[in-house]
């Protein structure tokens, strides 16, 4: 979980979960859907689904719309998984450097 510190910084204490892991573990496995099967049902290349579930590719807007339609979820659900994953990875990798390099400014209310 990421928690905002009082000074505005972030404490990052959980591992990033790739959207492909969610797709694989929470949707494909319980429903018995293969990579090839999902690719056929979504009308996308097998390589796209394979790369996503093997956590080598992210979810695009096009893929999010297709997954949302197929699994009766929302495109926002899939895009938010991707956004959260990327932000958490970047916080873990670069936040301390960014905090040192970038001066904070506030807008007067």
Identify the residue ranges that each predicted region occupies.
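Short, basic-rich loop-to-helix N-cap that marks the start of a DNA-contacting helix
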Residues: 56-69
């Amino acid at each position: 979980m990421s928690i905002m510190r009082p000074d505005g910084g972030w404490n990052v204490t959980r591992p990033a979960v790739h959207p492909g892991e969610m797709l694989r573990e929470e949707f494909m496995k319980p429903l018995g859907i293969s990579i090839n099967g999902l690719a056929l049902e979504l009308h996308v290349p097998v390589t796209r689904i394979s790369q996503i579930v093997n956590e080598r590719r992210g979810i695009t807007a096009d893929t999010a719309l297709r997954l949302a339609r197929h699994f009766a979820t929302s495109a926002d659900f899939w895009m938010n998984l991707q956004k959260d994953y990327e932000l958490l990875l970047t916080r873990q990798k670069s936040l301390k450097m960014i905090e040192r390099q970038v001066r904070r400014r506030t807008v007067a209310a």
